[in-house]
Amino acid sequence: MCRKEPFLLPTALCILAALVLHQGPVEALGGSRLCKTGFLEDVYHASVYRSVHEGQPLLNVKFTDCGADRRIHYETSNPTDFRIDGDGIVCASRTFDISPEQAEFLVYAQDEDTRELWHVTVKITLRPRHVQDLHQGFHKVREIKFSTQRKHNGLQRQKRDWVIPPINVPENARGTFPQELVGIRSDRDKSLSLRYSVTGPGADQPPLGVFIINPISGQLSVTKPLDREQIATFHLRAHAVDVNGNQVENPIDIVINVIDMNDNRPEFLHQIWNGTIPEGSKPGTYVMTVTAIDGDDPKQPNGMLRYKILSQTPASSSPNMFTINNETGDIITLAAGLDREKVQRYTLIIQATDMEGNPTYGLSNTATAVIAVTDVNDNPPEFTAMTFYGEVPENRVDVVVANLTVTDKDQPHTPAWNAVYRIVGGDGTGRFAIKTDANSNDGLVTVVKPIDYETKSTYILTVVAENQVELIRGIQYKPESTATVSVTIIDVNENPYFTPNPKLIRQEEGLFAGKLLTTFSAQDPDRYMQQTIRYSKLSDPANWLKIDPVNGFITTTAVLDRESIYVKNNMYNATFLATDSGIPPMSGTGTLQIYLLDINDNAPYVYPQEVEICDRPDPNAINITALDADINPNAGPFIFELPYSPMDIKKNWTVTRLSGDHAQLSLKIGSLDYGIYNIPIQITDSGNPAMSNTSYLRVKVCSCEHGYCSTTAPIIGTGLGTGAIIAILLCIIILLTLVLMFVVWMKRRDKERQAKQLLIDPEDDVRDNILKYDEEGGGEEDQDYDLSQLQQPDTVEPDTIKPVGIRRMDERPIHAEPQYPIRSAAPHPGDIGDFINEGLKAADNDPTAPPYDSLLVFDYEGSGSTAGSLSSLNSSSSGGEQDYDYLNDWGPRFKKLADMYGGSDD
């Protein structure tokens, strides 16, 4: 059913009564005609006020199924604004002002079984609200007069200005504009022609044109509806001047107050308010404050708000779990029984209404308050089982043995839900620990110390679980839960172990091979397994030892030497392996440490073994040191002596002991020749028995400068003799002569080759692509050229201009061709050299030279020869009639013919 407001009950009853009276005749006629399933009216009408509230009934639509007992479902076309219940009563779905577009909608009725559908139109007529006169702020048009000026005793005295009361104008006024407010007049308008004007905000200042004044009559008017929320008061000033613009009256101030109307709906600062309340809170506990604001005047009822709770979801544990202060908006608890495990969140619909909460004239708005019930620790954790079981192999650590599960009704992942586990019994040695899984809140029983199966094979642990925070007072449950964990240890094949490990023995060096050192045996921790152990060598750097694979006897295979490089600080380390016969086999390692005791088995020697001394030493002494691989007492102090043989050793040298390890070798004579001397020195250690050794000290005698050896003298002594220098010079001269002769021979060979090429027999000079294979520099691809280029060499494009000295001798010159004079006579046969040179020069300057330096072809005329038939040539008998001067134009190759048959008198 729609929620009926008390103030609308008479209206609803009237509407229902009218509908009943209106439908009476129809029902009376039901027996006289066939019944039709559907709505009883084609159109339903309702008359309501514009502002409606949520749940307010508007009208009742009637539907008949003609006694078929149909299951009818109703629905409106605008469910956001209107809803209909099963009895056909149409109610407002929310609080709002009905607009003309919303005043008409459809109501649907559908058979839930057959899905048959009917509909009807609903039209709502909006009734005006009967309120006090909205225009009570308008006073009857009155008149405001300017104060007059009087004269007293010949002086003009101004009358005190009147105090003009404010003019009240309601906002949002309706009607035609401009609307007259007040008339302004001066007493002097009877004698003068005056002009009236107003100034100030709303007149000649922004907002412009809100107020205007008739300049002749002085009537002040407002031009449009006012809005108090924008400007609550206007301050204007009225002026009166004559036609010349001279002020005739003092300006008067006019105050226009905009009267507030209830035209603003309350607005909540937030549409959704969130708050929290701990579960189990007592009645009267503060939750939160909701706030709404109203744009109307807060000093008037239009802006005075009142709050109330329209609904609470869910309604358990109490339908009125919360209440609200209607003036402040404070929400507090009204009833007890807040339990987060039952209801985690409450949703309240809060309504704010102006007009001090008057449901008839006030405007309302709603917001949602979401109140979350926060958790407190009112539920302890409880184990899901009384006993948990687990197993773990022996000697394993950081292994999860068992997973303990608990349940807690408090909010997950909070201190009231997080579990803390403790072991309170069965683990006296502290081999187990329990960690909490942050996600699942389970307890993970973990092994933190190795467990030996042979020592203990079963553990019974007693564990408890509790929350991170204490339970609140008044809870009847125990704060903790107890369970038992049974852990079984699994036996595994363990590694054999040597004892002791490492094993240290002391042994004098020099022990021969095959001697028994010690027994190094291992034990098997698996007492309940019948297994054998075998031994092997894992590490023996000097290869001095061997171990018996059955009993672990260690014997030597070489002489033990303390001075070996494998011995560090008198200690020699060897590693051995013990392996059992299990499946799979397990092994363990053991280290044998042999501390070698020193014996006197190393003779001392001198250090350094080579020194330098000046030929005239000053001081004439050398410091030497004795070294011994043995250690005390088999080393120093040492005895230094010079042998008696050879005799010159003691004659020239003497040795003096400075300390137990140091001595000084001195020169007895004043100087020595340059050279190298080997001085024998006999050194004896302090061992028992003592060991002696003769060491040779290499002494280099050299020339000294400022006490240090110099290399000048040896260099001078190694100079070359005169004969060697002369021999070197002769060799150099001979080499230069050979090079010069080779160069001269090469030049002569080049000249002979060039002369031979110019003196080729004319019979052999065919040049028909003759290819030479007996010379370097080219093959067929270099000399097999196009004959057309030889027939017409003038068509060949000249190459890029080359500097002098770079152009080939057979290239065509790019400058003008020289004019050759006609020879008067053939050269003398003896002048062959000049003939060759002239021919060479002419060939070099021949403009028709081929592009390659090779033999040319002269007997190939080809097609289209310009020579014509040979029959056209005249015989020698007609030489007087022939002109052979054109032979001079054919180049040097026809120069001989030109000389023989030319027109010269010679």
Curated annotation (Swiss-Prot):
UniProt subcellular location: Cell membrane; Cell membrane, Sarcolemma; Cell junction; Cell surface
Keyword list, A-Z: Calcium, Cell adhesion, Cell junction, Cell membrane, Cleavage on pair of basic residues, Glycoprotein, Membrane, Metal-binding, Repeat, Signal, Transmembrane, Transmembrane helix
Residues the entry annotates as binding Ca(2+) 3: N262, N264, D294, N302, D354
Keyword Repeat: yes
Residue spans of biased composition, Low complexity class: 863-880
Residues reported in the UniProt entry to bind Ca(2+) 2: E171, E229, D260, M261, D263, D296
Cellular component per GO, a single term: intercalated disc
Principal subcellular localization: membrane
Glycan attachment residues as annotated in the record: N274, N326, N403, N573, N623, N652, N693
Keyword Ribosomal protein: no
Residues annotated as signal peptide: 1-28
Single biological process term from Gene Ontology: homophilic cell adhesion via plasma membrane adhesion molecules
Residue ranges of the propeptide: 29-160
Annotated InterPro entries: Cadherin, Cadherin-like_dom, Cadherin-like_sf, Cadherin_CS, Cadherin_pro_dom, Cadherin_Y-type_LIR, Catenin-bd_sf
Cytoplasmic side: 747-906
SMART domains given in the database record: CA, Cadherin_pro
Membrane topology designation: Single-pass type I membrane protein
Limits of the Cadherin domain: 161-268, 269-383, 384-498, 499-604, 605-714
Ranges of biased composition (kind: Acidic residues): 776-785
Extracellular-side positions: 161-724
GO molecular function, one term: beta-catenin binding
Function: Calcium-dependent cell adhesion protein; preferentially mediates homotypic cell-cell adhesion. Cadherins may thus contribute to the sorting of heterogeneous cell types, and thereby play an important role during embryonic development. Required for proper neurite branching. Required for pre- and postsynaptic organization.
Domain notes: Three calcium ions are usually bound at the interface of each cadherin domain and rigidify the connections, imparting a strong curvature to the full-length ectodomain. Calcium-binding sites are occupied sequentially in the order of site 3, then site 2 and site 1.
Assembly, per entry: Homodimer (via extracellular region). Can also form heterodimers with other cadherins (via extracellular region). Dimerization occurs in trans, i.e. with a cadherin chain from another cell.
Protein name (Swiss-Prot/TrEMBL): Cadherin-2A
